Amino acid sequence: MNMNQTTSPALSQVETAIRVPAGIFAKYNYYSVFDIVRQTRKQFINANMSWPGSRGGKTWDLAMGQAQYIRCMFRENQLTRRVRGTLQQTPDNGTNLSSSAVGGIQGQAERRPDLATLMVVNDAINQQIPTLLPTHFPHDQVELSLLNTDVSLEDIISESSIDWPWFLSNSLTGDNSNYAMELASRLSPEQQTLPTEPDNSTATDLTSFYQTNLGLKTADYTPFEALNTFARQLAITVPPGGTVDCGYSACQPAV
């Protein structure tokens, strides 16, 4: 603050914001926003009931905001100066580097010989594969929000919908009783189909199953023992040297 300046620039902005005459804070021995925030909000309001009146709380809030901003700027400048000082102490050996550095650069083909074999496609880059399949994003979000409460959707709806009798007793059923059981299962819609779908693991001809799910017309799993075939039909990539266990249990339909 200049010697001829009685009020700091930050405090002048507070005066403008609350629409009081310029320099009025100096008359009450407030020359900067830090003079105001040294007091608590309640202390400042009680000590200045006569002139800011109902604007005392707003005045203190504005002064605190200005003080926080000044403090952040001071810390940022201090950190910047320290970084610059550290960099100046670090010796620059750039002039000692070999003038033939360009000729010694290792080529990309030598550094990453695997790039030519990688399959860079949209699915491989952008497709998000959850760790638990099948997945249903809206259901996952609901379960995440209920994780810390240890309640199910059934519990919430049963407490808010008294017109549903099937929540009162297991012996009562209604048009939505199946819906109530689905809510209590904590399974997503796709997961609920797994225990109810027909079991065809004992069928002698699984051609339809493999053609529908893996896109290859075959009666058994043996073609998928080849890693390239298995990865291609599932549209996935396997890292160099990677393996996939495609035994009978992996490629057979689940029981």
Swiss-Prot record:
The keyword Endoplasmic reticulum is assigned to this record: no
Key word Coiled coil present: no
SS bonds (residue pairs): none
Keyword annotations of the record: Plasmid, Virulence
UniProt-listed Pfam families: VRP1
InterPro entries xrefs: Insecticidal_toxin/plasmid_vir, Sal_SpvA
Source superkingdom: Bacteria
Family, per entry: Belongs to the SpvA family.
Protein function: Not known. This protein is involved in the virulence of salmonellas.
NCBIfam families, alphabetized: PRK15212.1 (NF011759)
The name this protein goes by in its record: 28.1 kDa virulence protein
